């Protein structure tokens, strides 16, 4: 019989709606969660104790030190405030979206590459995984379900590092969603804003079918 996996050390960067919801889900799943923003850690602790009981509020360098997973939950226009040195080598969830109609035209994202590829180029040494961008924060809180639940929702993920995707897949599963691997980071184009996946809710089989339609290639059944 295999021994239980140890809890993940999860650093959540950002204390907005998305960051606090994911921190709560991670705490509920039994993980060691550290929350950090650019504000003073003592000031953040006052907010964190109320919004996310069980989380540790700290500085960004301390939050990311030794973390198994980092969640970049900052607004897109602030992605360049992410500490590249602190994130180097880490599995990093990018859940940011580029909405030209909402954010206005941002020239660096007006390119053939996906927003995640642009962000991954900036982060350089980080192992970026695109996920959780096609589900709203309120749905994260309301739609998570235990494994095997027939109403469990699927979440797509894409990245170039298989080990990072394995960590992210475990995290998604343990907070209540079925992870479906879309492929490399560029495959995240299949669930950017304006796509059927971005605008819909799917179980794992349906998600694989949608990804196959988008990519015109088979998605592994164990994804």
Feature-to-residue mapping (PLM):
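Rossmann-like NAD(P)-binding element
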Residues: 52-103
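Short, conserved loop/helix-junction motifs that constitute active-site signature segments
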Residues: 84-89, 122-124, 147-149
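Rossmann-fold NAD(P)-dependent oxidoreductase module
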Residues: 21, 25, 122, 171
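General beta-strand structural signal in soluble alpha/beta enzymes
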Residues: 57, 127-131, 180-182
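Active-site-lining helix/loop region of Rossmann-like oxidoreductase modules
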Residues: 150-223
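NAD(P)+-binding Rossmann beta1-loop-alpha1 motif at the extreme N-terminus of oxidoreductases
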Residues: 1-49
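Rossmann-fold NAD(P)-binding glycine/threonine-rich loop
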Residues: 96-146
């Amino acid at each position: 019989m295999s021994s239980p996996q140890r809890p993940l050390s999860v650093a959540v960067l950002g204390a907005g709606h998305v960051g606090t919801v994911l921190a709560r889900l991670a705490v509920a799943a039994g993980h060691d969660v550290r929350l950090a923003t650019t504000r003073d850690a003592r000031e953040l602790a006052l907010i964190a104790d109320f919004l996310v009981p069980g989380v540790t509020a700290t500085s960004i360098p301390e939050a990311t030190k030794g973390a198994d997973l980092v969640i970049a939950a900052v607004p897109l226009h602030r992605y360049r405030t992410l500490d590249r040195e602190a994130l180097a080598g880490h599995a990093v969830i990018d859940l940011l979206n580029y909405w030209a109609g909402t954010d206005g035209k941002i020239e660096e994202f007006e390119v053939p590459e996906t927003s995640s590829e642009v962000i991954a180029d900036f982060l350089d040494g980080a192992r970026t995984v695109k996920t959780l961008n096609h589900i709203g924060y309120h749905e994260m809180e309301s739609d998570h379900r235990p494994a095997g639940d027939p109403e469990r929702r699927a979440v797509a993920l894409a990245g170039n590092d298989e080990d990072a995707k394995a960590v992210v897949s475990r995290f998604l599963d343990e907070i209540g969603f079925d992870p479906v691997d879309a492929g490399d980071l560029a495959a995240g184009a299949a669930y950017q804003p304006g796509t059927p996946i971005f605008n819909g809710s799917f179980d794992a089989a349906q998600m694989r079918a949608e990804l196959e339609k988008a990519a015109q290639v088979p998605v592994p059944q164990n994804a």
